[in-house]
Swiss-Prot record:
Classification lineage: Bacteria, Bacillati, Bacillota, Bacilli, Lactobacillales
Gene Ontology terms: biological process: selenocysteine biosynthetic process; seryl-tRNA aminoacylation
Protein name in the entry: Serine--tRNA ligase
Family: Belongs to the class-II aminoacyl-tRNA synthetase family. Type-1 seryl-tRNA synthetase subfamily.
UniProtKB keywords: Aminoacyl-tRNA synthetase, ATP-binding, Cytoplasm, Ligase, Nucleotide-binding, Protein biosynthesis
Amino acid sequence: MLDLKRIRTDFDTVAAKLKNRGVSEDTLTHLKELDEKRRALLVQSEELKAERNIASAAIAQAKRQKEDATQQIADMQKVSADIKTIDNQLVAIDQQVTDIITVLPNTPHDSVPVGADEEDNVEIRRWGTPRDFDFEVKAHWDLGEDLDILDWERGAKVTGARFLFYKNLGARLERALYNFMLDEHIKEGYQEIITPYMVNHDSMFGTGQYPKFKEDTFELADTNFVLIPTAEVPLTNYYRGEILDGKELPIYFTAMSPSFRSEAGSAGRDTRGLIRLHQFHKVEMVKFAKPEESYQELEKMTANAENILQKLGLPYRVISLCTGDMGFSAAKTYDLEVWIPAQNTYREISSCSNTEDFQARRAQIRYRDEADGKVKLLHTLNGSGLAVGRTVAAILENYQNEDGSVTIPEVLRSYMGGETVISPK
């Protein structure tokens, strides 16, 4: 959530930054007008309360002296009625301010490229060279069926579209991947966490999914619970409402969890395969950092995600998302896109973001600065390290062989009991 004081004092800068994120200046102007009206009413309310206190003291004195206080009482009752009217107006204005400010996206960092959509994203670097196949490559969904390791038909029967069963070495490959990912992140100083897979609505508000993106989630009927769309939500909210010791920062968390997404706006997109599912495993990284260190921590987090792809030998590129393509809470985002041979393109496999104090303000996560003793909002960062199902897809396609088998990447073999290849039955 943005700082209302910043909007008030640096309106033109905030308006210009949010314009690049598709927010109309009229919206901010309306918010500013509401804020000005609210502040004026607060002044009136305080003046009337002071007047009421004086009148109350005068009435008490008149009664002690057995004087007639009828007029003073009538005057005080009118003042009290005026205060109530103003307070009701303030409640209504506060709600309007909340309705606007809670759906405003974060302001982009100055280094973020300006653009309308993914076509305006900027490639930063590439790693690895896509393999030159001398046979016709298969898509990962066909490989999965031919190898009897992915069962889409029964997934659809048991649950519905965009669900599947992992079987045999497919299940072991998935498990090997997330164990490998967690182990690599732990080496980099991340604390492993097993989170709840359901969170309450306050947690969804804290990380920015609510109220704007409710339709993208699975809520449990007649409860305050939501299935997590990413472990970012419980990990970030771990410290919601707390004040941390500045000497402890930065703090690194990692967790593997299922992620549940309705994919409300994705009808007709990626209807086959592991790219877009309602339920999938993902290893998440979350950081809590001091403001002056957060962008250095973003670079480190991105490198941690890249490390996984490099050790798996998967070609990828790093993209800096433009203002029009970033997520709601992000101030800056790097996407990692892995090479998918059957599609002859790169597809997103990780997204690493610095939200600055946007989530921390919503969730009230603060720290006490050891330098001056003041309590301040910290910065939160999050990143995929990696989306496990998409990594399975990338391995199946990049490591496929002409005979229909798939070679298991060397770094995963110790996690799979020494298996070196997945062969057709």
